[in-house]
């Protein structure tokens, strides 16, 4: 089951990696899966695919190595994800931003909703749901 889930994930959630001088500078991706973040092989997760005509694609798993922060890595990744989601027929994007990521996404045209707190292993973590029309 786990291997089948991973195989499905790679087909439906393309991730991008940027390297510089052999070092990982950043990574991120977009998805056509209903699950906004985390794996969909857990109870209560919807593993279905999104419909580009009615649903928003999901921006997922954006990380930039501290040594490469504020050097355009995240912007390059996001622009590529937007282009690929648009090419797949999606007109909107959704994401769940960490609080430090909100200014970046807002500057990139995303609009935030009210903060939500999610329990991550017994620790409540605040996120801001954000969306953007392509």
What are these model-predicted stretches?
Residues 1-6:
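Conserved GNAT-fold acetyl-CoA-binding loop/helix
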Residues 12, 19-69, 84, 118-126:
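Conserved acyl-donor/pantetheine-binding loop and adjacent beta-alpha core of acyl/acetyltransferases
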Residues 67-68, 72-80:
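Conserved acetyl-CoA pyrophosphate-binding loop and the N-cap/start of the following alpha-helix
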Residues 69, 93-103, 119-121:
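Conserved beta-strand-loop-alpha-helix junction that forms the acyl-donor binding cleft
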Residues 78, 85-98:
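Conserved GNAT acetyl-CoA-binding A-motif
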Residues 106-115:
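Conserved acetyl-CoA-binding loop of GNAT-fold acetyltransferases
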């Amino acid at each position: 089951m786990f291997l089948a889930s991973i195989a499905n994930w790679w087909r439906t959630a393309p991730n991008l990696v940027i390297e510089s001088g052999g070092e990982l500078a950043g990574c991120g991706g977009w998805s056509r899966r209903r699950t906004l973040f985390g794996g969909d092989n857990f109870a209560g997760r919807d593993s279905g695919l999104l419909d580009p005509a009615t649903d928003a694609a999901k921006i997922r798993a954006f990380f930039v190595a501290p040594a490469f922060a504020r050097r355009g890595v995240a912007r390059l990744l996001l622009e590529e994800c937007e282009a690929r989601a648009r090419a797949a027929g999606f007109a909107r994007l959704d994401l769940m931003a960490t609080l430090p990521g909100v200014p970046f996404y807002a500057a990139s045209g995303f609009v935030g909703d009210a903060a939500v707190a999610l329990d991550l292993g017994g620790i409540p973590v605040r996120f801001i749901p954000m969306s953007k029309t392509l």
